[in-house]
């Protein structure tokens, strides 16, 4: 799980305005951090299939947010992909 201070750090880096916590960019960045954490977790816990299902769900959520952002504003989409290093 993501620690509160780490989450606040991510929000601070990707927010669009001062009180922004729910923009697609922030949500995508938080989900990406969770995906990275779970990927590392699976390197040592190969048989943790329950969490692997959760990972697939998170990846699907992120994909949906990325599709939404691509449809609404292509420049913001390209920017967030480049910042996070997500391959597409």
Swiss-Prot record:
Complex and partners: Part of the 30S ribosomal subunit. Forms a bridge to the 50S subunit in the 70S ribosome, contacting the 23S rRNA.
Entry GO CC: cytosolic small ribosomal subunit
SMART domains membership: Ribosomal_S15
Entry's Gene Ontology BP terms: translation
Cross-referenced NCBIfam families: S15_bact
Family: Belongs to the universal ribosomal protein uS15 family.
Domain of life: Bacteria
Classification via CDD domains: Ribosomal_S15p_S13e (cd00353)
Alphabetical list of HAMAP family matching this protein: Ribosomal_uS15_B
Function: One of the primary rRNA binding proteins, it binds directly to 16S rRNA where it helps nucleate assembly of the platform of the 30S subunit by binding and bridging several RNA helices of the 16S rRNA. Forms an intersubunit bridge (bridge B4) with the 23S rRNA of the 50S subunit in the ribosome.
GO molecular function per UniProt: rRNA binding; structural constituent of ribosome
Record InterPro entries: Ribosomal_uS15, Ribosomal_uS15_bac-type, uS15_NS1_RNA-bd_sf
Record protein name field: Small ribosomal subunit protein uS15
Record's keyword terms, sorted: Ribonucleoprotein, Ribosomal protein, RNA-binding, rRNA-binding
